[in-house]
Amino acid sequence: MQLNSTEISELIKKRIAQFDVVSEARNTGTIVSVSDGIIRIHGLSDVMQGEMIALPGNRYAMALNLERDSVGAVVMGPYADLAEGMEVQCTGRILEVPVGRGLLGRVVNTLGQPIDGKGEIDNDGFSPVEVIAPGVIDRRSVDQPVQTGYKAVDSMVPIGRGQRELIIGDRQTGKTALAIDAIINQRNSGIKCIYVAIGQKASTIANVVRKLEEHGALANTIVVAASASESAALQYLAPYAGCAMGEYFRDRGEDALIVYDDLSKQAVAYRQISLLLRRPPGREAYPGDVFYLHSRLLERASRVNEDYVEKFTKGEVKGKTGSLTALPIIETQAGDVSAFVPTNVISITDGQIFLESNLFNSGIRPAVNPGISVSRVGGSAQTKVIKKLAGGIRTALAQYRELAAFAQFASDLDDATRKQLSHGEKVTELLKQKQFAPLSVAEQAVILFAVEFGYLDDVELSKIASFETALLDYSNRNHAEFMQELNKTGNYNDEIKDTLKSILDGFKANSAW
């Protein structure tokens, strides 16, 4: 069969028209060294700071050092089988984690993957782990309380929604116990909770999860676990991942509480990464940006106004403010709060609860030192009844500590001093509280009323605990309606004062404890 030139021309044009060119521009590089979870990559000229780099075996690394002819990246997960010469490529994405209500009641790792064996998570989307904190115009002042259920905390160092309150102390002083009790106390308050465990033993994290489940608080809580066996990169990123999960609720006009346990271990993980990346070390071998490490995290905890929520939800949620309250934990060495990381975090937060090992060992638990524990913004968020009745507690304790030190050297004390010492001892005894036994606002109000108006004066020190138990039992049994109303409103006026007085008078007249 002979083809003429016209047919050949038509055939060529047809083939050209049907020819489909599929081209893909990929930014690739080659691993030149692998050491301690850090890879150095040649190439990747267009990589961004913090960008995810795709590695062989469906793994990722995060670009942290951008140098003239190489990139330093930290591997997210195991790196034993990575070798020189392997090809990697840019993804054009920064690290994102799943967010949404489907995470509540689940235990996830830093990347938001479930590790509790309960199947896949039904998330509402993804959010970048690094987000710029809301600006000044988007914020609203802190004026709503977060009740921890601890008399010592709610009366002397109150916490407000949107506040950052540091829990600081030596190891084994009850820092985690305080934070876990605060989470348990939110089970009926509507506040969603996130517990971020950084560098802890897996058995310790499992114990925390079990306790939350036992007390009915896990359904309201997301647990982000970066245990001691995880890589330094995952420990460094865990708080940011947890914060992104908490911001989901804040930005939709809800309230959330996040606990970082603890940021000392995160700083150590970041120091390890920085030294391996050969960044110049500073004080205590920490890198120069360790302050920024914590400040950019804790600034994201805030209370945002109605306009911000309405704008974020595109008008779906109106007239609601959102908040993310942070309880960062810092572990000190031998009570040294002037070390580098503790001073940094103290200066960033809105107050601190200082737990002292001497108090803890002498049986005062929670071991709150009222002298240097402070809440800078929580006072305006405190419920009226607690604010009114707790005014004299801190003063009484401060005077007691001062007199107790003086009384050690004085043999004969006048009656006024003896009375003050006795009162201080009773207040100290009354502020003791067992773990997993949070008190409601009304219960705290009844106890504080007894302190403020001298109902403890004729009670022996050894009987204080039984007096408190019997008083709460009497109040809840005989005045249940009043207690419920006080829990709801938190108000304080002459009528409430008279009712509290009648409760105490009736109890003292009729009860044996």
From Swiss-Prot:
Keyword field contains Ion transport: yes
Molecular function terms from GO: ADP binding; ATP binding; proton-transporting ATP synthase activity, rotational mechanism
E.C. number(s) listed in UniProt: 7.1.2.2
Marked site (Required for activity) residue numbers: S373
Record localization: Cell inner membrane
Annotated binding of ATP, by residue: G169, D170, R171, Q172, T173, G174, K175, T176
Mode of membrane association: Peripheral membrane protein
Name of the protein in question: ATP synthase subunit alpha
Gene: atpA
